[in-house]
């Protein structure tokens, strides 16, 4: 199984315009292409897939997708660190664990854990969409999962931030809220019209 490159995006201006009375067909094609333009996620996934394919071709020796393993995915993720924009403080840095350092420091810039985690998710999906078998997916390898966990824990300590997901409170169900409102209204109405009992010994 070889890497399937996407030479042009669906909305590329270099589409085949044809000749000889194809104006209306071209307009219809353009309109349908515009209506079926990929989502932001799909566009990013395609760019990531093309970037990974370029990395495999530039690898020494060049790698085919069929020979790609979790170890090669880790090489790719470490390669991307040189383009990172997230400051990750070293243990010896005085700002280690400081979420808002007051001054600059020489610590390196790295890819943020969240970016790497999202990238792996997109590439894992793209691998299978391009003919890869789920059981052979290198982006789902245990080594990749462990690496992402280590990056998350290290960056959380170095940057003094927490990556724990906050639990969102579920809003009350509309029907339940309406029922509660009706019950409260009925209770208030009933209380308003309920006459107090006569005092003991009152004349009938």
From Swiss-Prot:
Its main location: nucleus. It holds the Pfam family ALOG_dom. GO terms for molecular function: DNA binding. It comes from the Eukaryota. GO terms for biological process: mRNA transcription; post-embryonic plant morphogenesis; response to light stimulus. Coiled coil: none annotated. GO terms for cellular component: nucleus. Keywords: Developmental protein, DNA-binding, Nucleus, Transcription, Transcription regulation. Residues 1-45, 157-204 are annotated as: Disordered. It is found in: Nucleus. Residues 26-39 have a biased composition (Low complexity). Probable transcription regulator that acts as a developmental regulator by promoting cell growth in response to light. PANTHER family: PROTEIN G1-LIKE2, PROTEIN G1-LIKE5. Belongs to the plant homeotic and developmental regulators ALOG protein family. This is Protein G1-like5. It comes from Oryza sativa subsp. japonica. The gene is G1L5.
């Amino acid at each position: 199984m070889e890497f399937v490159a996407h030479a042009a995006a669906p909305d590329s201006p270099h589409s085949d315009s044809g000749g000889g009375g194809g104006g209306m067909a071209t307009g219809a094609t353009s309109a349908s292409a515009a209506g079926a333009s990929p989502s932001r996620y799909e566009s990013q996934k395609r760019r990531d897939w093309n970037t990974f394919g370029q990395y495999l071709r530039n690898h020494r020796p060049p790698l085919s997708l069929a020979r790609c393993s979790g170890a090669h995915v880790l090489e790719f993720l470490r390669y991307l660190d040189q383009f990172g924009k997230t400051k990750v403080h070293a243990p010896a840095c005085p700002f280690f664990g400081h979420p808002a350092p007051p001054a600059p420091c020489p610590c390196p810039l790295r890819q943020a854990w969240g970016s790497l985690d999202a990238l792996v998710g997109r590439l894992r999906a793209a691998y299978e969409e391009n003919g890869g078998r789920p059981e052979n997916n290198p982006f789902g390898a245990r080594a990749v999962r462990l690496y992402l966990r280590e990056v998350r824990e290290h960056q959380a300590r170095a940057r003094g931030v927490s990556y724990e997901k906050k639990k969102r409170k579920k809003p009350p169900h509309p029907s339940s809220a309406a029922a509660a409102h009706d019950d409260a209204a009925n209770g208030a109405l009933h209380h308003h019209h309920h006459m107090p009992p006569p005092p003991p010994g009152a004349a009938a």
